[in-house]
A protein has these predicted regions:
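Bacterial N-terminal signal peptides
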Residues: 1-6
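Sec-type signal peptide cleavage vicinity
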Residues: 7-222
Length: 222
C-alpha cells in the first residue's frame, strides 16, 4: 500500500482544540515545511544517509474532512531546501479550510528520478480521494534487495504542537503569505537490512587462524 501511515481522524486530541477554527473559502497562500524522517526499521541494503533521506520531488495532497481532494500539486524545481535535501518547504496556494489532512509522496519517477518503484505523476493525478490513495499499490520495477540512491517516501503533515495529530487548519492569508503550523514528515516506504556475519574460534580448538569465504548468499522472507 502506498499510504501506510496510520490515520488519526477518528478521534481528536485535546491539544487540537487549541487551534482556532478559521473562516473557510478564503484565498490562502501558505508555506508548508517538510522534513524526512529517519526510519529505525532496517530490512534492505544500506545507503549513505545523504541518499536515504533525500527528497528530490514532492507530490502534495490536501484532503477535506470528507476525504475528497481539496488541493494537489507536484513540486520539483519549486522546492526550497533548508541546509540539505532532507528538509525544506513548498508554497501552497489554495483556499482556507478546517480539519484537513495533508499527505505527501516523495520521489516519484521522472526522467531524472528513479526510486525502483514505478510510480509516476500520472498515477497521482488519477487519485480522487484519500481512500483511492490508501488503496494504491506501488509496484517495483525489479525484484531485488539492492537499492537505488533515490527512495519513495510517503507521509502526513503533523501539528507542530501535537506530533500525533494530522488534522490541520489552513487559514486565509488576505494580508500576505503565512506558514502552516505543521510539518510534512515523509518516511521511506521500503526498509533496509544489515546482515552481520561473525566468525569466532571454537573454545575447544587451538586454531591460530580462521578463514571464512562464503560462496554465495540468498535472502528469503524479507
Amino acid at each position: 500500500m502506498l499510504l501506510a501511515v496510520g490515520l488519526y481522524s477518528c478521534t481528536e486530541d485535546p491539544l487540537f482544540e487549541e487551534r482556532a477554527r478559521v473562516a473557510e473559502g478564503l484565498p490562502a497562500r501558505v508555506m508548508l515545511d517538510f522534513r524526512s524522517e529517519k526510519s529505525c526499521v532496517e530490512t534492505r541494503a544500506a545507503q549513505d544517509a545523504t541518499y536515504e533521506n533525500r527528497v528530490n520531488n514532492l507530490y502534495v495532497f490536501i484532503f477535506n474532512p470528507a476525504g475528497e481532494v481539496h488541493y494537489r500539486n507536484f513540486f520539483t524545481d519549486d522546492i526550497s531546501y533548508n541546509g540539505d535535501y532532507s528538509k525544506g518547504s513548498v508554497m501552497i496556494e489554495t483556499t482556507s479550510l478546517n480539519k484537513v489532512q495533508i499527505v505527501c509522496i516523495a520521489n516519484l519517477s521522472t526522467e531524472s528520478v528513479s526510486s525502483g518503484y514505478d510510480v509516476k505523476k500520472s498515477d497521482m493525478e488519477s487519485i480522487t480521494s484519500r481512500s483511492d490513495l490508501e488503496a494504491f499499490v506501488m509496484k517495483m520495477d525489479e525484484h531485488t534487495v539492492e537499492r537505488s540512491t533515490q527512495f519513495m517516501m510517503t507521509g502526513y503533515a503533523y501539528d507542530d504542537k501535537n506530533s500525533t495529530s494530522n488534522l490541520v487548519n489552513i487559514p486565509g492569508t488576505e494580508s500576505g503569505p503565512a506558514s502552516l503550523e505543521c510539518t510534512l514528515r515523509p518516511e521511506r516506504t521500503d526498509a533496509r537490512v544489515e546482515f552481520v556475519v561473525k566468525t569466532e574460534k571454537p573454545s575447544d580448538k587451538n586454531w591460530t587462524a580462521l578463514d571464512f569465504r562464503p560462496r554465495g548468499w540468498r535472502v528469503v522472507n524479507v
